[in-house]
Amino acid sequence: MSHSVKIYDTCIGCTQCVRACPTDVLEMIPWDGCKAKQIASAPRTEDCVGCKRCESACPTDFLSVRVYLWHETTRSMGLAY
């Protein structure tokens, strides 16, 4: 089952989430929206195992990276109808 990984614009470019990910789902890409001039990106979500280590590593008050497990995504989509 595939999980959804969302990166929010509150990312400060610290790379903590990228280093915490055991399956290399995340990488840093150039972005002018923060002081670090980079932001996390999730190009390989199919490799996400749902461990949420990236969430735990995020130092921002509002988590900049969130993992939505496949069953959480399915449940929330059902509420939209």
Swiss-Prot record:
Binding of [4Fe-4S] cluster 2, residues: 21, 48, 51, 54
Topology in the lipid bilayer: Peripheral membrane protein
Family annotation (Pfam families): Fer4_21
GO molecular function: 4 iron, 4 sulfur cluster binding; electron transfer activity; metal ion binding; mRNA binding; oxidoreductase activity
Co-factor remark: Binds 2 [4Fe-4S] clusters. Cluster 2 is most probably the spectroscopically characterized electron acceptor FA and cluster 1 is most probably FB.
UniProt keyword terms in alphabetical order: 4Fe-4S, Chloroplast, Electron transport, Iron, Iron-sulfur, Membrane, Metal-binding, Oxidoreductase, Photosynthesis, Photosystem I, Plastid, Repeat, Thylakoid, Transport
All copies of domain 4Fe-4S ferredoxin-type, residue ranges: 2-31, 39-68
Main localisation: plastid
Catalytic reactions of this protein: reduced [plastocyanin] + hnu + oxidized [2Fe-2S]-[ferredoxin] = oxidized [plastocyanin] + reduced [2Fe-2S]-[ferredoxin]
Gene Ontology annotations for the cellular component aspect, listed alphabetically: chloroplast; chloroplast stromal thylakoid; chloroplast thylakoid; chloroplast thylakoid membrane; photosystem I; plastid
Keyword set includes 4Fe-4S: yes
Enzyme class per UniProt: oxidoreductase
Cofactor section: [4Fe-4S] cluster
Binding site for [4Fe-4S] cluster 1: 11, 14, 17, 58
EC numbers for this chain: 1.97.1.12
Localization terms from the record: Plastid, Chloroplast thylakoid membrane
Alphabetical list of InterPro entries matching this protein: 4Fe4S_Fe-S-bd, 4Fe4S_Fe_S_CS, PSI_iron-sulfur_center, PSI_PsaC
GO biological process: photosynthesis; photosynthetic electron transport in photosystem I
NCBIfam families the record matches: PS_I_psaC
PANTHER family recorded: PHOTOSYSTEM I IRON-SULFUR CENTER, PHOTOSYSTEM I IRON-SULFUR CENTER-RELATED
Subunit description: The eukaryotic PSI reaction center is composed of at least 11 subunits.
Function according to Swiss-Prot or TrEMBL: Apoprotein for the two 4Fe-4S centers FA and FB of photosystem I (PSI); essential for photochemical activity. FB is the terminal electron acceptor of PSI, donating electrons to ferredoxin. The C-terminus interacts with PsaA/B/D and helps assemble the protein into the PSI complex. Required for binding of PsaD and PsaE to PSI. PSI is a plastocyanin-ferredoxin oxidoreductase, converting photonic excitation into a charge separation, which transfers an electron from the donor P700 chlorophyll pair to the spectroscopically characterized acceptors A0, A1, FX, FA and FB in turn.
Protein's UniProt name: Photosystem I iron-sulfur center
Organism, as annotated: Arabidopsis thaliana
Phylogenetic placement of the source organism: Eukaryota, Viridiplantae, Streptophyta, Embryophyta, Tracheophyta
